Amino acid sequence: MPSLKDLKNRIVSVKNTRKITKAMQMVAAANIRRAQESAEAARPYAERMNAVMSSLAGAVGSTDGAPRLLAGTGSDKVHLLVIMTGERGLCGGFNANIAKLAKAKAMELLAQGKTVKILTVGKKGRDALRRDLGQYYIDHIDLSDVKKLSYPVAQKISQNIIDRFEAGEYDVATIFFSVFQSVISQVPTAKQVIPAQFETDAASASAVYDYEPGDQEILTALLPRAVATAIFAALLENNASFNGAQMSAMDNATRNAGDMIDRLTIEYNRSRQAAITKELIEIISGAEAL
C-alpha cells in the first residue's frame, strides 16, 4: 500500500499533467476555428478547379497528345505513396489512422506485385512508416519550420512529386491525408493525384465551353496547378483534422486526469484517516495499560 507521501506526490504530479493537457486543449481550441475556416474556404476553389479540369480533360480525352500528367505513363507498376501526417503527437489516433490506411494500401499493392515508394510529409508519419516499411521509404519533406500553411508550401510539395514523375521514378502517385468533418470526426482518405483524376458532375458534363488558345494548351498549363491545389486542400484538411483531434484528445486527457485526482484524493484521505485511527487506538491502548 503506498504511503501518504507517495500518494501526495502522485496527486501533485497528476495535477501538473492536467495543467499541461488543459493548456494544450485551449491552444487547439484557439487554432481549430481558423483551421476549419481555412479548410472550408478552400473547398469551393478546389471543387471549381475540379469542374474546369474535368471539362478540359473530357474535351482532350485520352488522345496521343494528352499531357502525361493526365494520360500517365501507360503503366501502373510503380506507385508513389505521399503520406501526410502531423509534425507533433498528442492528437489521439490522427497520425496512426493515416499511417494505417497507407500501410494497408502499400501491402495491397505489394501483394499485387507492384513496386511501392513512400514519401512522407510530417514527422510522425515518417517515424512510423520508416519503422514498419523502411525498405520502401525514399524521402521526407520537412514542414517543421512552416508557421502557416500557404499555397507556395503546397507548390513545393507538388513540384517535388511532379519532378519525380517526369524523371520516370513512378507511374502513379496517391496522397494520404485526413478529411475534417468535426472536432470528433476525421476521416483518413486516399486520393490519386498523378495521373490526375477529376470527378464529373452532371452540370459540368452537360455544359459546353470554348477555351482560348485551346483545350490542350490550357489543360497542360493548368495540370501542375491542379495537383498543387489538391495538395493544398489536403494540407488544410489535415491541419483542421489535427487540431480537432488534439483538442478532443486533450479534453479526454484532462477529464481522465481529474478522475484520477479524485480517486487518489479519496485514497489519500482514507489512508490518512486509517493512520489517525491507528494512532488513536495506540494512545488509548497505552492509557489503559497505565
Curated annotation (Swiss-Prot):
Keyword terms of this UniProt record: ATP synthesis, CF(1), Hydrogen ion transport, Ion transport, Membrane, Transport
UniProt-listed InterPro entries: ATP_synth_F1_ATPase_gsu, ATP_synth_F1_gsu, ATP_synth_F1_gsu_CS
Claim: Transcription is one of the keywords in the record: no
Membrane topology: Peripheral membrane protein
SUPFAM superfamilies noted in UniProt: ATP synthase (F1-ATPase), gamma subunit
Domain of life, per lineage: Bacteria
Principal subcellular localization: membrane
Cell location: Cellular chromatophore membrane
Keyword Transport listed: yes
Biological process, per Gene Ontology: proton motive force-driven plasma membrane ATP synthesis
MF-aspect GO terms: ATP binding; proton-transporting ATP synthase activity, rotational mechanism
GO cellular component, one term: plasma membrane-derived chromatophore membrane
Family membership: Belongs to the ATPase gamma chain family.
NCBIfam families in the record: ATPsyn_F1gamma, PRK05621.1-4
PANTHER family (alphabetical): ATP SYNTHASE GAMMA CHAIN (PTHR11693), ATP SYNTHASE SUBUNIT GAMMA, MITOCHONDRIAL (PTHR11693:SF22)
Main function: Produces ATP from ADP in the presence of a proton gradient across the membrane. The gamma chain is believed to be important in regulating ATPase activity and the flow of protons through the CF(0) complex.
Quaternary assembly: F-type ATPases have 2 components, CF(1) - the catalytic core - and CF(0) - the membrane proton channel. CF(1) has five subunits: alpha(3), beta(3), gamma(1), delta(1), epsilon(1). CF(0) has four main subunits: a, b, b' and c.
Protein name (record): ATP synthase gamma chain
Species per Swiss-Prot/TrEMBL record: Rhodobacter capsulatus (Rhodopseudomonas capsulata)
